[in-house]
Amino acid sequence: MKKYLLSLLLSPAFFSNLTAQNNTPWNNKKAAVVLTYDDAVNQHLDNAIPVLDSLGLKATFYITGYSSSIRDRMNEWKKLAANGHELGNHTLYHPCVGGVGREWVQPDYDMSKYTLRRMVDETRMNNVFLQALDGKTKRTFAFTCGDMKIGDSSFIGLLKNDFVAARAVRAEMHTIDKVDLYNVDCFYVNGQTAAQMMEWVKKAVETKSLLVILFHGVGGGNSLNVLVPEHRRFLQYLKQNEKDCWIAPMIEVAEYVKKYQSH
């Protein structure tokens, strides 16, 4: 038996399979790319979804429950979820920590005035709302403004049973063994060209890493914006490079990472 195991471990087939796993750790691809869209604005429905669906690409849309687009176009958001896109949780009212440089934060939704209980309760309420939209009980979360604490206390620890993963905003990439599922890094888009975003993808493939991209406005809807032609050109590039890139919603990639890291 020992001789058999030794011969198996030394066999070319074993090393070939091991090499293949090391070279294609992301669902048999070199890299994973997750497209995320924050705040549920009309331009996601008007400008992002048509391109994504025409190319057969699936993304994650981080939904703030109070969004006027959700209120006015709810059936379209339901259709989006039914078509394979993830509706992620981006809180009920999009609270952020106010202060210098963030004068736009409304006093009622200033996270510096929140309690841990209020943050957790509002976030869980948004989960209930999203479940009513898509029927799903598993989803991921995105920190608003990248703010992760109420005072000095992190709140995500209280929500780990509610979410498979949580996306933050630090611009870094990590290999599958180094991904922190409750502090997933991402690159946010603010005026970048398709060519600039393509460089992110090339780096992810070279380093066999997870690349998460954060869009806000797509042809408008937010001051953090990408032009429609650049967005379309970038998605077309992704589609052309599916042989190297696994492109999937955050929930699918997070569950894959969780399974990998548990072994």
Q: PLM features: what roles do these ranges have?
A:
Residues Y37-A40, T91, G217, M250:
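Active-site metal-binding loops of divalent metal-dependent hydrolases
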Residues A32, D53-G151, N161-D162, V169-V184, ...:
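Metal-dependent polysaccharide deacetylase catalytic core of the NodB/CE4 family, i.e.
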Residues D38-D39, V51-L55:
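Conserved beta-strand->loop/alpha-helix structural units within folded catalytic cores of enzymes
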